[in-house]
Amino acid sequence: MRFEVGRLVVHRNVRRGRIGWVRPARVISDDERGLLLWVAEGSAVAGEVNAAGLGMRAVPFAEWLTPTFQLKQGRWNGPPLLKFLPAGAAHSVWWFRDAQGRFTGWYVNLEETGVRWDDGGLAGIDIIDQDLDVWVRPDRSWEWKDEGEFVERLAFPEHYWVTDEAAVRAEGKRVIALAEAGEFPFDGTWCDFTPPPEWETPQWLPAGWDRPPVR
């Protein structure tokens, strides 16, 4: 399944069958290398919160384990993001920029390979974020990110969606080797990308954004 260039799709994170977050994105390209998406600053988004209205990262994981959740809509308050999901890979790469639009680094999001869906009116890709990440600077030096959260959650195997710690770390090391070598996509590709001016920022999540996950 391929997505048409310019189409608005939803990129969703799924946790044990529940939607964790939703971000609408425009398709820049979709080919044998993978899927390239653009998330505009200020886009309408949604994220899972507990009964107190707090997101998962705002509380200890032990306190997050409650049967009461809801999806809260809001705005993407981070920088505009370029997201590349390599075909068949267990990670995605995000290009970060500063307020002036200058490239500041690559964020490697370790995740289970995305599963696509297309309902006709709306399409998307569902991933399972594995929480451990890698930050790669423009000079290709790097560091692990969110390792504390990753280790904390591994202590709750009956509730956590990551089942193979070694595989996650191995994927991270594999991508780190690519970055250190300056190989694609850490070779300067897309660092100066600018979206077409006609691509409007999604002010509302498209109908069907909360359809049941496919994974």
Could you describe each region identified by the protein language model?
Residues 78-132:
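Structured beta-strand/loop patches that form or line metal/cofactor-binding pockets in enzymes
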Residues 30-33, 99-100, 136-139:
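Short acidic-glycine loop/turn motifs at beta-strand connectors
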Residues 170-215:
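Cysteine/selenocysteine-centered motifs that mediate thiol-based redox chemistry or coordinate metal-sulfur cofactors
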Residues 46-51, 119, 153-158:
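A short, polar/proline- and glycine-enriched secondary-structure boundary/capping micro-motif
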Residues 35-39, 102-109, 141-148:
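Short, well-ordered strand-loop elements centered on a beta-strand within folded domains, enriched
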Residues 15-16, 25-26, 121-123, 132-133:
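A generic local secondary-structure boundary/capping motif
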Residues 1-79:
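Charge-rich, low-complexity N-terminal segments
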